[in-house]
Amino acid sequence: HNIVNPIQTNGLLLDRKWCSFFRENGFLVGISLDGPEDCHDMYRKKTGGQGSFADVMRGMEMLKGEGVEFNVLCAVNDYNSRRPLEVYDFFRSTGARFVQFTPVVERTDPSGGLCAGEGAENARLTPWSVLPDTWGRFLCDIFFRWVRNDVGDFFVNIFDAVLAGYVGREPGNCYFAKKCGHALALEYNGDVYSCDHFVFPEYLLGNIAGDNLRDLRESPAQKTFGEAKTKSLPRTCRQCRYLNICNGECPKNRITPSGEPGRNVNYLCRGYKFFFSRTERYFTFMAGDLSAGRNVLAVKDVKF
């Protein structure tokens, strides 16, 4: 088997020794970075309350100095979502060539604890969650900057995933895939959960101290979890023209009632539809070029 070693870090504890280890062993390092300094420091603070931006950038420079392959993972929240082009241009300036934008959608129960996606009673959306309309505009603004200037040079995970849907391929992420359950979550104590978005008691599969990891991945409980993504889609999703692109997105975010019991709509649906509708012609053009074996860079000069 070919073993690939990616690691996700906030970058605070990176030093030369770690960076050398990553380089020597071919690690891909994901750095959590939420944009320019004020955007990043809004929510990513150290234990003393200070912002962590300077430390993260120091760690990134060490990775670059050691020749370690890295990419950026950006949590899009209520604050940085209002400044899409500043965020995008900042990432371009860092020397990164790949960025993953992850929308922050979190709910808490009356006690303040985080809730699972569907079925949580009396849950409230956190104030730092991104708004659906803002998420859609965030994606659009960045897309039109990217499609005119950076196609082929800079890679945005969600754009790649959408294009995959247009050409009938599996996306490179789980949340646009038809089924869930391919990536288990392993906790520090050996507990294994169905997904890192569902680290809750009802999604505990077992523990690697006594269970075989392959058996847990192929267990009936995990199979049911994975298939539920499609089986629980409401009618409005099943009839949507963009179903083959987003497949209802992540079940964690399906918290908006659809009128059908147990079949919620994705909280971000309105934002996604806004983005899909305004970029459809561009993705259709790129999909045509890909299917014909042509280079997609021609889309930079297309005018619709």
Regions from the language model: what does each represent?
Residues 1-24, 29, 33-39, 47-58, ...:
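Canonical radical SAM enzyme core domain
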Residues 17, 55-58, 82, 86, ...:
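Generic recognition of stable, solvent-exposed alpha-helical segments in well-folded globular domains
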Residues 42-54, 61, 65-175, 179, ...:
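Radical SAM enzyme [4Fe-4S]-AdoMet core and its adjacent flexible, acidic
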